[in-house]
Amino acid sequence: ENCNKGLIHMDASSRDENAIAGLIYLTPNADLNSGTSIYKLKDNYKFKEEDGEHILKLKKELYLNDNIDTKEWDKMIKKNHNDFDETIKFNNVYNRMICYNTFEWHSAMSTNAGDDDRLTLIFFIRGIHAGMYPLTRVSSMPC
């Protein structure tokens, strides 16, 4: 049920204070619902370090094509998605590029792009030197 959902995560590390993540969808005629969602943590969410370690272990098993326990993965994805509210949804449209702050929580809406694999080009832009991002500038202006 949840096996085709992506894991909600962020790409940030301590060196990514002024970094942008982006991706370009490269599957022609993909299922629109195989795009990307941006999330915010629910107010009552309390992150536990062991949750993060468990997620990394399962993710490594998945990427290395080890025999992953699909019931365990399904349970973890369900819990992961229950901790967040979706705020933005980008449909998978061929050659569409999206960008977001590396501190934004995000996931693949579905890993099933239809007849073909969900193919994306992921990139990071680091070392942006500016006083403030446009959104920060606008947010700090008096009304």
Model regions and ranges:
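Catalytic core of non-heme Fe(II) oxygenases with the double-stranded beta-helix
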Residues: 2-143
